[in-house]
């Protein structure tokens, strides 16, 4: 699980890394990347929604030894996409539920990946986040909010350490509700 910070690139690395991106968010950005370096876009898998087909494709890639990267600080592009609002940088912010539901379905370990530029070089930080994400049927939304909150805490820590290196190209706080108010509008 990564964020829109620093620079993420795996060219020349010994592990095959595939980035899973929302198609709607990525169209223009991917076209720009394709012009700059076609090798990078070859490592992108675009999805419209995180459903059963996406989970099957991801499981096949994991079974083949790939590492999958999903940014956890991007909400679904389509209206009504499932989000949870958690505390983040002194306010409430929406975070996608998809990464947590998929990690639960795939029963795979979850690592956090941050990239920070320091002294003219990018440094990659990997953290073990969870050996397994478990979302029991009872209180599922509460468990999702807990995992998203833990992720938001780690992201906030990195934002405080390198405040000009976290970026999103849309209004990140648009539609945010009070933390814990994850009801009513189809986004919970």
Q: What is each of the regions a protein language model found here?
A:
Residues 1-49, 64, 78-84:
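Catalytic core of membrane glycerolipid acyltransferases/transacylases, capturing the structured
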């Amino acid at each position: 699980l990564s964020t829109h910070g620093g620079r993420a690139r795996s060219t020349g690395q010994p592990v095959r890394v595939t980035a899973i991106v929302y198609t709607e968010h990525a169209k223009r950005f991917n076209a720009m990347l394709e012009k700059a370096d076609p090798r990078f876009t070859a490592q992108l898998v675009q999805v419209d929604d995180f459903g059963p087909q996406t989970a099957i494709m991801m499981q096949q890639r994991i079974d083949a030894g790939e590492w999958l990267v999903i940014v956890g600080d991007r909400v679904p592009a389509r209206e009504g996409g499932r989000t949870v609002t958690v505390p983040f940088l002194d306010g409430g912010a929406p975070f996608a539920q998809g990464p947590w539901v998929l990690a639960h379905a795939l029963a795979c370990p979850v690592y956090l990946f941050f990239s920070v530029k320091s002294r003219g070089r990018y440094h990659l930080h990997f953290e073990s986040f969870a050996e397994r994400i478990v979302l029991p049927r009872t209180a599922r939304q509460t468990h999702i909010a807990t995992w998203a909150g833990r992720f938001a805490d780690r992201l906030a820590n990195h934002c405080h350490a390198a405040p000009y290196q976290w970026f999103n190209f849309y209004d990140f706080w648009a539609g945010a509700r009070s933390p814990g108010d994850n009801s009513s509008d189809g986004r919970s």
